[in-house]
Amino acid sequence: MHSELKNVSKHLAELGAGILAQAQKNALYTGYYSHLDEGVLGVMQAAQAAELLIKAAIAKQHPLLIFSSVPKSTSVSGELLSMQDIFEDGKTIQYAELPEKLWATTGYKLPNQDVYKSFGKLRNTIQHFALPKRDVRAETARFIYAVVDPLMGHFWDDYAVNYVDVVEAKDDIFELLSNYGIKPRYPEELKDFAESVE
């Protein structure tokens, strides 16, 4: 394996967590002077964050497992497959196929796959067609805490509540989630904030 490929999992996990922080900001908080409901952006970002985090978990096994096709040895420029070769001729696994690939490579069965599939359809509807008449903020929050948070717990011993791109989010994140009927997992250092809502 080319040395460039060794940090793929770490890169995808960091990128996914960063996008998750933006997704939660847009899904749970309301900004000002926006012509578009930020909740719509939260849908797009949460789906992308999930996709990246699942790929990061798969890539821990081997980075090429996130690809459905890779360049052939006759089409690469050097002795080993490089990142440039993959950028030009590789194709990654699609969103809908990721839960099965995750299970096949790691043995981990993504929880709430019905939520995962439904949320993928919601993302596609927004991206390709129109804005649905649904509470996209609530659906995004449920998706994050039913699908993404357990994934983070299993592979990184981490929590989705740690990734909200708002200063001092810990002060109100649990109340905001409670409004959607969500009681998230949380690290010990957030126990007092979480229990103040119960």
Q: What annotation goes with each model-predicted range?
A:
Residues 3-14, 33-41, 110-117, 138:
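Short, solvent-exposed segments of well-ordered alpha helices
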Residues 13-27, 119-124:
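Active-site-adjacent bridging/hinge elements
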Residues 17, 38-60:
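Short, hydrophobic, well-ordered secondary-structure elements
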Residues 23-34, 61, 126-133:
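Secondary-structure edge/capping motif, primarily at the C-terminal ends of alpha-helices
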Residues 54-67, 135-138, 161:
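Short, solvent-exposed secondary-structure capping/transition elements
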Residues 59-119:
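A broadly used, surface-exposed interaction patch
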Residues 109-136:
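Histidine-centered, metal-coordinating catalytic motifs and their short helical/loop contexts
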Residues 114, 132-198:
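Polyanionic, low-complexity intrinsically disordered segments
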